C-alpha cells in the first residue's frame, strides 16, 4: 500500500506515488490558479478547491501563496465575473462630493457603491481587530450632554439636507468609537457579551437579505432553518421530537410573555375573544428573585402586578417549594384561580437554578402550567457536565431560552418553546388575508407568522444556525464549560482574601460570582447599619472610576437588604484567566483609597 505521506521527489518522479493522488507541478497549479482568477467566482472557486484537494500539503501552501501574491499584485479583494470585468478593486475615492443618491440603484452607481461599502467593511474590520486587543479600552466614556453637544465633528442632530458620504463614514467610525465594546474580553457588565465572527457574518448576510419571517413565501430558507433549530432545541430539553412548537422572539421578556399568554389560552380559550371579563380571578406565581419581565407581563396582559404572587427564596436565591404550595392554597382560599408558575434556570443576579422537579410535582398536583425561564441558564443544556442543574426541565409546559446569552449568539436571539403543538397558533392567529392565504401553492403550515404577536419579525435564526453549523453542539459545550471554569477560578481567587467578601457561601452554580470589595477603611469593622451604609457606596464609586478609565466593566446592584455588591458574569469565550486577574487587580487599584 502506498504511503499517504507526500514523496519528497514527487516533482521529479511519480514512482511509488499513490495512484489516487494528483501531484501537480508548481508551474501547472500556478497556471490553473491563473485560469481560476479569469473565471466566474463560482467556477473559479471550484477550480481552486480541486487544486487544494489534490495536492500535497507543501504544494497546498504554495497554492495559497500564489493566490495571495496574485491578489496583492492586482489589489483585488475577490474574484468576480470576468464577463463584465467586475472585480472589486480598491481605488482612491473622494467621498466629500458623493451622496447617497449616487449609490445603487442609481444609474452608474455600482463603482461608488463598491468603494463606499469597502470603506465600511474596513471600518468594521478595524473595530473587530481592536475589540480583541486588550490594550484597547472597553469604552471611551462621555456624559450624555457631551455626546449631545457634539464630539469632534460627530453630530447626532438630523438635518433636512443630505450629508456627504464622507460625513457618513465619519459617523460610522464615531458611532463605534463612542460605543461600548461588548465583545471585549474584559467586558463583564451584562449577560450578553462577546463578538462571534461566524455570528457576525450571519448578521451581515441577514441584513443584506432584508426579509421578514412571517411567511415561507418571502423567507423560505430562514423559515426552514428556524423550524429545524427549534426542533433541535426541543429535543435537547427532552421533549418528543414529533410534537411541540416554538418561535424566535425579540428577547427573553417577550418569550416569557408568550408563555403566560399560551397558558391562559390553554386553560381559558375564550379569553381570546371575550377578554379578561370572561375568566375567573387568575393569579400567577414567580420567585422573588425572578426576572422582572414576569411582573411586566402581568401588567401588560391585564392580570395586574398584585396578582403576580412572589414566592420566597432561600439564601442562594432558589424557590422554596413549601412556600410555593402554601401560596397556592392561600390564593385558592381567597377565591383566586392559580394557573401558572415561572421557575428560573439561572437567575439574573445570583445565577440560581430553581428546583424544577419539586416545582413540577406541585404543578401536577394543582394543575398549573409550568414555565421555565432558562433565558440565562438554557445554554447549560448543551453541556454534559452542567445540564443536571436543569433536571426536570423536560416536565415544563414551556421554556424560554436565549442563545444570545450563554451561547454567545449576537443580539437578538431568544426562543419560546412550547411542549404542546397548536397552542401558539390558536392563541395568536388572526388570519390576515393579505399574508396568510390558505390556497397557496405550498404547504402553508410553514407560514409561521400567525403564531407571533408581531406582524413583522426580524430574522434572528440565520446567525444562530450558522454558528451551530460552524461549532457543532460540542463547540457550544466547550465554550460554555470554559466560562463556568472561569467563574470557578474567580471564586477560588477571592473567597479567602480580606479585600473581598462573598455575598453567599458556596461555589457559584452559574458564571455569576457576587461579592463585595472591602476597602481598607472597612476591613475588620463589625457589621452595623453604618458599615452597610458606607459599603453601599463602594461599588458605585469603583464602577464610576472604572468607566472613566475604560479598562473594564462589571455590574453591581443591591439585593433585598444587602448593600450594593459586584455581580460578575462570564459569557464571552474570548475571556481568559488573565482577564479575571486583571479585573481583580483593577478593582483593588480603583478602590484602595475609598
From Swiss-Prot:
Biased-composition ranges, Low complexity, are 1-13
According to the UniProt record, which cysteines are disulfide-bonded?
Answer: none
The source's domain of life comes to Eukaryota
Top-level EC class as recorded in UniProt: lyase
Which PROSITE patterns does the UniProt entry name for this protein?
Answer: DDC_GAD_HDC_YDC
Ranges for region Disordered: 1-23
Keywords for this entry? Decarboxylase, Lyase, Neurotransmitter biosynthesis, Phosphoprotein, Pyridoxal phosphate
Example GO biological process term? gamma-aminobutyric acid biosynthetic process
For this record, an example GO cellular component is: cytoplasm
- List of residues that carry N6-(pyridoxal phosphate)lysine: 405
A molecular function (GO) held by this record is: pyridoxal phosphate binding
What is its cofactor?
Answer: pyridoxal 5'-phosphate
Positions with a binding annotation for 4-aminobutanoate = 190-192, 567
- On whether Cytoplasm is a keyword of this UniProt record, the answer is no
As stated in the Swiss-Prot or TrEMBL entry, residues carrying the post-translational modification Phosphoserine are 78
Q: What EC number(s) has UniProt assigned to this enzyme?
A: 4.1.1.15
Q: Which CDD domains does the annotation name?
A: DOPA_deC_like (cd06450)
Q: Which reaction does it catalyse?
A: L-glutamate + H(+) = 4-aminobutanoate + CO2
**Cross-referenced PANTHER family, in alphabetical order?**
GLUTAMATE DECARBOXYLASE 1, GLUTAMATE DECARBOXYLASE-RELATED
Q: Which family does it belong to?
A: Belongs to the group II decarboxylase family.
Task performed by this protein? Catalyzes the synthesis of the inhibitory neurotransmitter gamma-aminobutyric acid (GABA) with pyridoxal 5'-phosphate as cofactor.
Its subunit composition reads: Homodimer.
Q: What is this protein called?
A: Glutamate decarboxylase 1
